[in-house]
Amino acid sequence: MRNSLYKKNIISINDLQRNELELVLNKSAMLKRTPQPNLLKNKVIASCFFEASTRTRLSFETAIYRLGASIVGFSDGNNISLEKKGETLTDTISVISSYVDAIIIRHPQEGSARLAAEFSNKKPIFNAGDGANQHPTQTLLDLFTIQETQNRLTQLNIAIVGDLKYGRTVHSLTQALAKFKHNKFYFISPDALKMPNYINNMLDKKEIYWKRHNNIEEIISEIDILYMTRIQKERLDSTEYANAKSKFVLRAAILKNARNNMKILHPLPRIDEIDRDVDYTPYAWYFKQAANGIYARQAILSLVLIEKHL
């Protein structure tokens, strides 16, 4: 197959065309069915987490080890010498790029991954999250999970709940699903955490249906995917947070009118926004979603680092 992802930076989901997304999803399914433990043998990949992470970092590292590659790097940028010495991000990336075949980066500054790509000496950059901006590999595993559970990425009704203003996962997911035809979006959030206008304007420009709703109950019988996110306490004043915490919680009783095919996703960590009782329903899919991150990240790593694939 033609591999247009070879040596490509994975900075934003917007950098990937629909056919490239489909290429990653097909490769993800292939690797889930048939492991390829030596696919990236002799490759060395840097894992540079300037911001703390558990799931994303461990998922990437597991993907790397299962492909036979080696990994170097750090998991807490605040405790490494380059931060204490005041070295710039660009200098750090320039040096690290001379050691490795690719760099995974998470950084609190928006735009940091694209900046890193300018100084990586043509070594591919994988964005593992840059501030509130983008988280493309989370989106790839989300798409893989949606396709796996719904057998399609078109003609879906998707409800997205929680922090839609600062949540980079929901921005990337909406942009990705907008590449596929006839999807509809239902946005549910506190007024202070509404989806940014640039996302709404993008949907309007593409003539894609979207609407704000006040609660999950209003739309539970209409949706195929319920994508929950946590509301961060520091984003709201105490009164707003108390109201949001009670209003935007998914309880098992709400699911009585759900479609049989409906699945609940969450980028994790889950705090209070999904009751533990929901875990035992057939709709709960967030832990299987997290497990799919290994296959999606294996797929994108291998497609970027190896030109020819069967």
Swiss-Prot record:
User: What's an example of a GO molecular-function annotation for this chain?
Assistant: amino acid binding
- A Pfam family found in this protein is OTCace_N
Q: What is its EC number?
A: 2.1.3.2
User: Which chemical reaction does it catalyze?
Assistant: carbamoyl phosphate + L-aspartate = N-carbamoyl-L-aspartate + phosphate + H(+)
Which domain of life, per UniProt? Answer: Bacteria
| Pathway membership | Pyrimidine metabolism; UMP biosynthesis via de novo pathway; (S)-dihydroorotate from bicarbonate: step 2/3
Arranged from A to Z, the UniProt key words for this protein are: Pyrimidine biosynthesis, Transferase
Q: Which GO terms describe its cellular component?
A: cytosol
Which residues make up the binding site for L-aspartate? K85, R168, R230
One GO BP: amino acid metabolic process
Where on this chain does carbamoyl phosphate bind?
Answer: R55, T56, R106, H135, Q138, L268, P269
- Protein's job: Catalyzes the condensation of carbamoyl phosphate and aspartate to form carbamoyl aspartate and inorganic phosphate, the committed step in the de novo pyrimidine nucleotide biosynthesis pathway.
For this chain, the family text in UniProt reads:
Belongs to the aspartate/ornithine carbamoyltransferase superfamily. ATCase family.
Describe the protein's quaternary organization and the partners it interacts with: Heterododecamer (2C3:3R2) of six catalytic PyrB chains organized as two trimers (C3), and six regulatory PyrI chains organized as three dimers (R2).
Per its UniProt record, what PANTHER family does this chain match? ASPARTATE CARBAMOYLTRANSFERASE (PTHR45753:SF6), ORNITHINE CARBAMOYLTRANSFERASE, MITOCHONDRIAL (PTHR45753)
Protein's recorded name: Aspartate carbamoyltransferase catalytic subunit
| Organism annotation | Buchnera aphidicola subsp. Acyrthosiphon pisum (strain Tuc7)
User: Which lineage do the record's taxonomy fields give for this organism?
Assistant: Bacteria, Pseudomonadati, Pseudomonadota, Gammaproteobacteria, Enterobacterales
